[in-house]
Amino acid sequence: MVNFKINGTSFELSGSEKVNLPLMVCSHERSGTHFVMNSISKCTEYTANPFLNFDYSPLGSLINFFSEESIRIFLNSLKNIKYNDSINYCTNSIIKSHFPLTLLGNDAKNLCKVIYIYRNPEEVFISFWKFLNRWDWFEGPKLNSPLELMKSNPKGQSQRYQVENYKNYFERWASHILIAKKEQKNSKNIVMVNYSDLENNFSKTIENICNKLEINIISTPSKPNKEEYIFGKDLKLSYEEKQLMKSFIREEIQKFPALPNDLKELFN
């Protein structure tokens, strides 16, 4: 563990001689980010304790998140963390990000390895609705249902991850995934994974991720404890409200034919 310092700001990171590129886990909010981070942490040299939150807190004074050059300089610095004034290691602290992958620029393959996780929008928006209602600041609109949230235009602090304005949160969610899909075509260092694959075929999915990204598995993959997740407010949703959600998603998802088939097939 090292107290990594850059431009006067410091934060705790782990480093390892056994990794050569940082690992980023990226997603739209509430898509299983911590699930995959903690899963990888339990069976590889990468660790989620501590992880690095790629966000304005703690990095707002260090990075222009909308500058490819600024991001490149920062991520390159994570490949050369000095230990004991002599040894340089790459960080093995997993980088958590909700920014769209396009902001990594054309050099993404040389900057880091990326796991992009996506999830059934019904599950995403139930969780996101509870998450936004949890905070005492304006992270986003505190509405009466996830259906209202999907229909609402993005507001509050949640807008910090956007490169453009969106008609509603559903369009924002779909666009985030479509950007990742486009970026994956240009880099062998980006792997997309469906949350349901981790739920239903955990070990095989983790092995596939690690094989594609050339990450060494050092222990048998095992699911992390639920206590390690971040929960939203305890809110209840009726069966009728869930059915209205499904109907809305079934109609809206047709507007984004390039979404992964395993998402579209859920609402045929």
Where in the sequence are the language-model features?
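PAPS-dependent sulfotransferases, especially Golgi type II membrane carbohydrate sulfotransferases
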Residues: M1-L23, N133-D136, P146-L147, K155-K167, ...
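PAPS-dependent sulfotransferase catalytic core
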Residues: M1-I87, N225-Y229
